[in-house]
């Protein structure tokens, strides 16, 4: 189950957490890779699959322009967005109370957990680490992707852009991103 939608996880603040999507079969080394990155880059969120935020001047570009990166030198940056389909490591103490604010979640970002988490990372200036050797895309379980969030968020409805715009208007994420650099 993912971190945001599982209620009652306030006690995870003091713990390391690894999230994976429950509709995928992951490579055997998924957790090992995440832990290895976390040892090298403590106090950062770590992901096996990364997108890079793309800007048009001082504004965020549309989500489809955020490049998905499967292979790159390991780096830690505010530009990196950890994508849940690769598994994500969260260090202890990385988030604030708003992470579990269901009123804000339901109003601004009800179905894009990766973006909700990224917005909270930007607010707290928490970098995301990713990269290294090629990480193969996990195998989709049959019949699980017909109505997946990924299709709704990235498909014709394009909910990712709508939800990111709403979060940006709420918290001025573009200003935080430009001020704090990449």
State what each model feature region is:
Residues 2-13:
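Single conserved hydrophobic/aromatic residue that forms the stacking wall/gate
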Residues 14, 41-44, 126:
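Short, high-confidence coil segments that cap the C-terminus of an alpha-helix
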Residues 27-103:
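Conserved catalytic core of nucleotide-sugar-dependent glycosyltransferases
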């Amino acid at each position: 189950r993912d971190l945001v939608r599982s209620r009652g996880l306030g006690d995870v603040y003091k713990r390391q957490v690894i999230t994976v999507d429950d509709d995928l079969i992951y490579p055997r080394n998924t957790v090992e890779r995440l832990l290895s990155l976390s040892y090298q880059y403590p106090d950062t969120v770590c992901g096996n699959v990364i997108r890079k935020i793309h800007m048009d001047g001082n504004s965020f570009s549309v989500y489809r322009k955020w490049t998905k990166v499967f292979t790159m030198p390991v780096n830690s940056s505010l530009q990196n967005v950890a994508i849940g389909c690769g598994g994500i490591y969260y260090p202890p103490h990385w988030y604030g109370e708003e992470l579990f604010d269901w009123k804000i979640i339901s109003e601004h970002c009800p179905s894009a957990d990766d973006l909700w988490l990224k917005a909270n990372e930007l607010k707290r200036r928490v970098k995301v680490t990713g990269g290294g050797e090629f990480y193969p895309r996990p195998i989709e379980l049959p019949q699980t992707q017909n109505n997946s969030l990924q299709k709704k968020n990235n498909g014709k409805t394009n909910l990712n852009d709508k939800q990111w715009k709403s979060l940006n208007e709420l918290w001025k994420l573009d200003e935080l991103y430009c001020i704090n650099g990449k």
